[in-house]
Regions:
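Start-of-domain marker
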Residues: 29-105
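Hydrophobic, well-structured mid-protein blocks that either form specific transmembrane helices
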Residues: 125-168
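Bacterial N-terminal signal peptides that target proteins for export
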Residues: 2-14
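Membrane-proximal, glycine/serine-rich, low-complexity loop/turn segments characteristic
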Residues: 26-32, 251, 261
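Gly/Pro-enriched, hydrophobic low-complexity segments
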Residues: 154-261
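An acidic-aromatic
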Residues: 87-135
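C-terminal motif of bacterial Sec signal peptides marking the signal peptidase cleavage site
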Residues: 21-24
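Well-ordered beta-strand positions in beta-sheet-rich domains
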Residues: 75-79, 98, 116-118, 177, ...
Length: 261
């Protein structure tokens, strides 16, 4: 664990902080299966997707993160807490690395390197190759589309036992693709790419689970590809509780050097 934490670079810390908060929950009942209906329209599938979004106030638990950048691979378990629409907090063992994210702020510190970062979402957006804000992270957390599918028209076909949605009018800078699983109409895969910049962000939801009657992601895999790098992260969520009391202990230690990006 200490070897892992010493090896964390600024880029890895920000990437892992952003990815760790892009998902949720572990319980004993995993949701699988479902049968696609070839008669459903894109509009009907999108409507069902929004009707089935999770509704909870707080989240508290742990997530096991497996990270690989092509040159090295690491594993770490972190604590995660969330108050919906307000805050996301994570902490490595002994509080050696902590992150605190609100709708207008991204902040973290690393006690091993005596450094901290406190700023907006612009660096995370650049790192992941797409615009990122608190709402997008929260949607990723709950298996919801990271863009509002109701704002444009989509074509639909069936692919690997899921509904595949592609925009009828493809974007010039960004290309998007969504796959929705048929049992609960949650995301099976989200893909955003910038072909001109050789960037790809792909989030695949391995399965879902039921927790307090809510359907939430159980395991997630993320690929973040740029022209020069490929980062792969796998998430497994454990001991998650919903709607309990949570707090977010976070204070940047005095004397730490600010990271300027």
């Amino acid at each position: 664990m200490m070897k892992f934490l010493r090896g964390i670079t600024i880029k890895q810390t920000l990437l892992m902080a952003s990815i760790v908060i892009m998902a949720s929950c572990k319980s004993t009942k995993v949701v699988t299966g479902g049968t696609v209906d070839e008669k459903l329209s894109a509009k009907s599938v999108i409507k069902a997707h929004y009707q089935n979004q999770a509704n909870f106030k707080t989240l508290n638990g742990k997530v096991r993160v497996s990270y690989s950048d092509g040159e090295s691979s690491q594993n770490v378990s972190v604590s995660i807490r969330m108050e919906k629409d307000k805050a996301i907090w994570m902490s490595a063992p002994l509080g050696i690395v902590k992150a605190y994210i609100t709708p207008d702020r991204v902040s973290f510190y690393n006690k091993l390197q005596n450094e901290y970062f406190d700023g907006d979402f612009s660096y995370l957006s650049e790192l992941l190759g797409t615009e990122v804000d608190f709402s997008i992270l929260q949607n990723l957390l709950t298996g919801q589309a990271i863009v509002d599918l109701r704002q444009e028209k989509y074509g639909i076909d069936l692919f690997e036992e899921s509904y595949r949605l592609t925009p009828k009018l493809p974007g010039t800078l960004y290309k998007t693709l969504f796959r929705i699983e048929p049992k609960n109409y949650k995301m099976a895969l989200q893909q955003l790419s910038q072909p001109l910049k050789n960037r790809l962000l792909e989030i695949s939801y391995e399965n879902y689970q039921i927790l307090n009657k809510e359907i939430l992601p159980n395991e997630i895999k993320i690929r973040a590809i740029t022209k020069d790098n490929e980062n792969n992260i796998a998430l497994e969520f454990r001991n998650i509780e919903l709607n309990g009391a949570v707090n977010f202990p976070y204070s940047i230690p005095k004397g730490f050097k600010e990271i300027e990006l």
